[in-house]
């Protein structure tokens, strides 16, 4: 596996591959890999001739009081794991390479970014959209894969690609879970042994909602009331949001007449965790 650190070298490699008729697959990451990341790489490996994974902790998507300084990092391990799953190039730029002195251009996707994470993290999606469109221009992929745990992010990227006429296929990959059903996340590392059981309320709340819908419940308020009661059952858990949204538009859903995104975000202690599922009412 080749390691590339500069924009110019990555662009040159991408140009060489494209001239040779190679299909480029891409997985953008912030590193500290878990099985979820590796599943994305395996998926794109089956979709492309050459695979690039980027490792870049993007400062533009962190707010002033968020965990940029403490976000977990282990580059040597990440590079080893990426090589083992068949990544051809790891693109590992420094902050100054992506945002040199004088940088002043940002990409903003409206509407789909307004609720949920966009409401509680106002700079997040501007930072995500900006870095992803930059990476697309640098890596020049034909196809890119994103995890569905960050469902609103996936919708945002698809909207951006459509609106900016980018010729890139965007694929989603289902949430990958730990054996205890906690959605895999680099931030799970922050949880203490005492907090881990509290974090499992997320997946339990999703299961309860699915069961409610399977029994015929269509009233969003009823479903959300039960979900919030399960999440807010004492201990150091604070709900950021628990909402039903249209999976394509991110508009709020009251009565479920079709598939609906149940999106959850909670703080367990100081660690913010997200999870989601698509609720599908029976016809």
Curated annotation (Swiss-Prot):
The active site is at residue 37. InterPro entries: Pantoate_ligase, Pantoate_ligase_C, Rossmann-like_a/b/a_fold. (R)-pantoate binds at residues 61, 153. Keywords: ATP-binding, Cytoplasm, Ligase, Nucleotide-binding, Pantothenate biosynthesis. ATP binds at residues 30-37, 147-150, 176, 184-187. SUPFAM superfamilies: Nucleotidylyl transferase. It is found in: Cytoplasm. Its EC number is 6.3.2.1. The keyword Methyltransferase does not apply. Pathway: Cofactor biosynthesis; (R)-pantothenate biosynthesis; (R)-pantothenate from (R)-pantoate and beta-alanine: step 1/1. GO terms for cellular component: cytosol. GO terms for biological process: pantothenate biosynthetic process. It catalyses: (R)-pantoate + beta-alanine + ATP = (R)-pantothenate + AMP + diphosphate + H(+). It comes from the Bacteria. GO terms for molecular function: ATP binding; pantoate-beta-alanine ligase activity. The keyword Hydrolase does not apply. Its main location: cytoplasm. Beta-alanine binds at residue 61. Catalyzes the condensation of pantoate with beta-alanine in an ATP-dependent reaction via a pantoyl-adenylate intermediate. The reaction proceeds by a bi uni uni bi ping pong mechanism. Homodimer. Belongs to the pantothenate synthetase family. NCBIfam families: panC. This is Pantothenate synthetase. It comes from Syntrophobacter fumaroxidans (strain DSM 10017 / MPOB).
């Amino acid at each position: 596996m080749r390691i590339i650190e500069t924009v110019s070298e990555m662009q040159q490699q991408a140009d060489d591959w494209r001239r040779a008729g190679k299909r480029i697959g891409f997985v953008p990451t912030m590193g500290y890999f878990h099985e979820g990341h590796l599943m994305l790489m395996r998926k794109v490996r089956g979709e492309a001739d050459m695979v690039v994974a980027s490792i870049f902790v993007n400062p533009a998507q962190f707010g002033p009081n968020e965990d940029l300084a403490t976000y977990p990092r282990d580059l040597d391990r990440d590079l080893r794991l990426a090589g083992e799953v068949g990544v051809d190039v790891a693109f590992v730029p420094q902050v100054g390479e992506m945002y040199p002195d004088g940088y002043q251009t940002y990409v903003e996707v409206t509407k789909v970014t307004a609720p949920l994470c966009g409401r509680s993290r106002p700079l997040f999606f501007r930072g995500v959209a900006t870095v992803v469109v930059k990476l697309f221009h640098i890596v020049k992929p034909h196809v890119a894969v994103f995890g569905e745990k960050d469902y609103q992010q996936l919708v945002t990227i698809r909207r951006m690609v459509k609106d900016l006429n980018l010729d890139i296929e965007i694929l989603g990959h289902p949430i990958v879970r730990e054996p205890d059903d906690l959605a895999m996340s680099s931030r799970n590392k922050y949880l203490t042994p005492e907090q881990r059981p509290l974090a499992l309320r997320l997946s339990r709340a999703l299961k309860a909602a699915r069961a409610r819908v399977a029994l015929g419940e269509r009233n969003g308020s009823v479903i959300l009331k039960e979900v919030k009661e399960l999440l807010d059952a004492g201990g150091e858990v604070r709900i950021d949001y628990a909402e039903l949204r249209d999976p394509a538009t991110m508009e709020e859903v009251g009565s479920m007449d079709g598939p609906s995104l149940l999106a959850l975000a909670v703080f367990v202690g100081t660690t913010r965790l997200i999870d989601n599922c698509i609720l599908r009412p029976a016809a």
